[in-house]
């Protein structure tokens, strides 16, 4: 399969890395990336990959799938640059947050075979999760897009495009929440007198081990939490402080704020 990426940043690089690791020929992958340094890094990392600085008819010729991997505010210009040449392409995939299929279709001159996805940064190590939505009638496009994102992690499909705003807030932004709590646990360990290297190792191992335990268990997270918590014990003392501070409610509010921002971003882009 011939794949052309519009944008060659971290997420595009992660997807290319996943494809190559699964046996894809780098020579079947093209990337349009205006930054000279990033183009050089991509070509050095994936020998045979074809990289160029501009969106021209040549980079879409023969492509089975075009992947838009640019920032949301760059999407309109990027789409309009390739619009005269996109009609023969079997499928388009966008991973730009907030950019709705209808708007991308409009910028592409009415192109109808679009799949929209929200990946996350653990894709950089092949451990991402992406949620995809396909425009009505884009079943064939969905079949082309799915394996591209499966190359760097799990995938799920949603039936309603508006659900991607919630997905953006949960899994798209989710790694930042995890890193926030990881950072706090590490800082607490240091403030309790542990050496910095040991604090980091303990925090990382605790998160990694807890997730392995959760994924391998049939128990709900609440039950797993209760299993660690003895009445009047050390864990209970910590959780009492979190409850008194309303941490759970505030955290839920934070995720909802991210979802609202995703919706607002989509609304703003729709006006272009």
Positions of predicted regions on the chain:
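NAD(P)+-binding Rossmann beta1-loop-alpha1 motif at the extreme N-terminus of oxidoreductases
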Residues: 1-57, 61, 127, 190-191
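Rossmann-like NAD(P)(H) cofactor-binding subdomain of soluble oxidoreductases
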Residues: 36, 46, 55-132
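Short pre-catalytic strand/loop immediately N-terminal to key active-site residues, enriched for Gly-Thr
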Residues: 163-169, 221-226
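NAD(P)-dependent Rossmann-like dehydrogenase/reductase catalytic/cofactor-binding core
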Residues: 204-272
